[in-house]
């Protein structure tokens, strides 16, 4: 039920039911074209896999970070919050599957608003926490290269920053929950966003709202941080701390490649679909709908990739997980 699923202002309601595609709504105007059988099977299967993998991966992250006292660090606190956001999102795909198979919203309006809010939390909070983690890495790696400590970088400060991120995300997501409601479309009850008049203006504003606040600003910030860091590291003169500098360069290179590659891979097609939806009027062909569901599924997969990217690539995390599992087995 991504907000990027909205098709256009020509519809009575300016939103689509979940799980909605990104380039068009199957019920935007007139009867929805029949989905090809492979797509009708693939969509719920893919959503189920995303839910299962995301639930398992993020549960493992939470299990280790909450049960291992030595892992209570600033970085791990941000990873913990990221895992919480992704874990919450795993509640969305099962609801989307039910809506997809039944072709109508089978639940009440309260759950409609809740699912919309959780879905939007995934869109915004993940990149917001990645931005905070990037800023933290910027300070830490640069301080390491210069053989100094980051002033004020404490666990308590990280808690305050995390609460601030959740607060900002809540304010950003709140309008979607307000506009979410049940509505009859073509004789079917749907969970949609019903915008006031003029619908065309509100629809375009909602797309630009997500594009700017949910992608352009955080990704630009991440790029500026790592570009600046790489430039500053290259400018630092090698001295007796050359080994620390070399390690810092390696860490920042891995972080730049991992964060930016995954971020762009997952979110760029999703947000480019906003530009397409705003500038073109694509016919709702089976191909367009299939591409739309693929883009939506790719953005959903973000909740699966984060645990591997930010936790499972850490050797110490794997050791902690094995130790905790061994303790549970022997107890």
Swiss-Prot record:
Family of the protein in this entry: Belongs to the G-protein coupled receptor 1 family.
Domain of life: Eukaryota
TM stretches of this protein: 44-66, 76-100, 116-135, 161-180, 206-227, 252-276, 287-301
Source taxonomy: Eukaryota, Metazoa, Chordata, Craniata, Vertebrata
Disulfide bonds: 112-191
UniProtKB keywords: Cell membrane, Disulfide bond, G-protein coupled receptor, Glycoprotein, Membrane, Receptor, Transducer, Transmembrane, Transmembrane helix
Its biological purpose: Interacts specifically with a number of opioid ligands. Receptor for neuropeptides B and W, which may be involved in neuroendocrine system regulation, food intake and the organization of other signals.
Localization terms from the record: Cell membrane
Key word Chaperone present: no
Pfam families in UniProt: 7tm_1
Protein's GO biological process: neuropeptide signaling pathway
Membrane topology: Multi-pass membrane protein
Residues in coiled coil: none
Glycan-bearing residues: 3, 13, 27
Keyword Chloroplast attached: no
A molecular function GO annotation: G protein-coupled receptor activity
Positions in the Extracellular compartment: 1-43, 101-115, 181-205, 277-286
GO cellular component term of the entry, any: neuron projection
Topology, Cytoplasmic side: 67-75, 136-160, 228-251, 302-331
Protein name in the entry: Neuropeptides B/W receptor type 1
């Amino acid at each position: 039920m991504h907000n990027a699923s909205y098709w256009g202002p020509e519809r009575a309601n300016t939103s689509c039911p979940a799980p909605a595609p990104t380039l068009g709504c199957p019920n935007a105007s007139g009867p929805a074209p029949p989905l090809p059988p492979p797509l009708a099977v693939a969509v719920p299967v893919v959503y189920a896999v995303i839910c299962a993998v995301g639930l398992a991966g993020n549960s493992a992250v939470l299990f280790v970070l909450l049960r291992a006292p030595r892992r209570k660090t600033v970085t791990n606190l941000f990873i913990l919050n990221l895992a919480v956001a992704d874990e919450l999102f795993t509640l969305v795909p099962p609801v989307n599957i039910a809506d997809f198979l039944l072709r109508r919203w089978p639940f009440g309006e309260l759950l409609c608003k809740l699912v919309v809010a959780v879905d939007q939390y995934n869109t915004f909070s993940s990149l917001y926490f990645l931005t905070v983690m990037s800023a933290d890495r910027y300070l830490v790696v640069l301080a390491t290269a210069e053989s100094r400590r980051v002033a004020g970088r404490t666990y308590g400060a990280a808690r305050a920053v995390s609460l601030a991120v959740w607060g900002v995300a809540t304010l950003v997501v709140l309008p979607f929950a307000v506009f979410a409601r049940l509505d009859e479309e073509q004789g079917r009850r749907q969970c949609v966003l019903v915008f006031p008049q003029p619908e065309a203006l509100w629809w375009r504003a909602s797309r630009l709202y997500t594009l700017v606040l949910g992608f352009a600003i955080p990704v630009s910030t991440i790029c500026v941080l790592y570009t600046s860091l790489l430039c500053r590291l290259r400018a630092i003169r090698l001295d007796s701390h050359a080994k620390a500098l070399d390690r810092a360069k390696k860490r920042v290179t891995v972080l730049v490649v991992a964060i930016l590659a995954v971020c762009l891979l997952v979110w760029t097609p999703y947000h480019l679909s906003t530009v397409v939806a705003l500038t073109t009027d694509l016919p709702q062909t089976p191909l367009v709908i299939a591409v739309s569901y693929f883009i939506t599924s790719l953005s959903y997969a973000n909740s699966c990739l984060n645990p591997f990217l930010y936790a499972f690539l850490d050797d110490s995390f794997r050791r902690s997980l094995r130790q905790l599992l061994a303790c549970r087995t022997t107890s």
